[in-house]
């Protein structure tokens, strides 16, 4: 797979995760509602930024980003969540798994971009990896 193709898959993943985390944000139940509501808002905002950054990088590489949800659904590898009631521990476990998946995908992006001599995408991917690894560490500590 080429760099721009991985970017498109990640763009699809980002928009699906944006919606998935909104579902958690709106439908969390329990005594820690306020904390989880705030935390999930921060997370879905990160996915919105990621979606836009990925699209802009795709354009910079001379390709067209995803512009429809139907395209995103075809390309995503993220499992959508259709339930509408959640407890915080389940939410954070699911987000942790999604972060681990993204970590793997951004490593692939970094390696592929490196092989193609695309230093800008390598830097972007490595920056995302640093953020994801910190988030993974924090969620693992929270769930311990």
From Swiss-Prot:
Changing residue 140 to E: In strain: 8826, SS1, DB2, G21, MI 355, MI 356 and Y06. InterPro entries: DPS_DNA-bd, DPS_DNA-bd_CS, Ferritin-like, Ferritin-like_SF, Ferritin_DPS_dom. GO terms for cellular component: cytoplasm. Changing residue 46 to G: In strain: 5060d, YS8 and Isolate 96T/KAD. Fe cation 2 binds at residue 56. Its EC number is 1.16.-.-. It catalyses: 2 Fe(2+) + H2O2 + 2 H(+) = 2 Fe(3+) + 2 H2O. 12 di-nuclear ferroxidase centers are located at the interfaces between subunits related by 2-fold symmetry axes. Protects DNA from oxidative damage by sequestering intracellular Fe(2+) ion and storing it in the form of Fe(3+) oxyhydroxide mineral. One hydrogen peroxide oxidizes two Fe(2+) ions, which prevents hydroxyl radical production by the Fenton reaction. Required for the survival in the presence of oxidative stress. Dps is also a virulence factor that activates neutrophils, mast cells and monocytes. It binds to neutrophil-glycosphingolipids and to sulfated carbohydrates on mucin. It might have a role in the accumulation of neutrophils and monocytes at the site of infection. Belongs to the Dps family. Homododecamer. The 12 subunits form a hollow sphere into which the mineral iron core of up to 500 Fe(3+) can be deposited. According to PubMed:12672049, colocalizes with DNA but according to PubMed:9228091 it does not interact with DNA. This is DNA protection during starvation protein.
């Amino acid at each position: 797979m080429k760099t721009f193709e991985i970017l498109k898959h990640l763009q699809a993943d980002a928009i699906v995760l944006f919606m998935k985390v909104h579902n958690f944000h709106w439908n969390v139940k329990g005594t820690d509602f306020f904390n989880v509501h705030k935390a999930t808002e921060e997370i879905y905002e990160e996915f919105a930024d990621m979606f836009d950054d990925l699209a802009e990088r795709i354009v910079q590489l001379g390709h067209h980003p995803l512009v429809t949800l139907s395209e995103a659904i075809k390309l995503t590898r993220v499992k959508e969540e259709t339930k509408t009631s959640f407890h915080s521990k389940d939410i954070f476990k699911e987000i942790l798994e999604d972060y681990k998946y993204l970590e793997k995908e951004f490593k692939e992006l970094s390696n592929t971009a490196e092989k193609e001599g695309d230093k800008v995408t390598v830097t972007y991917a490595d920056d995302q990896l640093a953020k994801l690894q910190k988030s993974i560490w924090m969620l693992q500590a929270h769930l311990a």
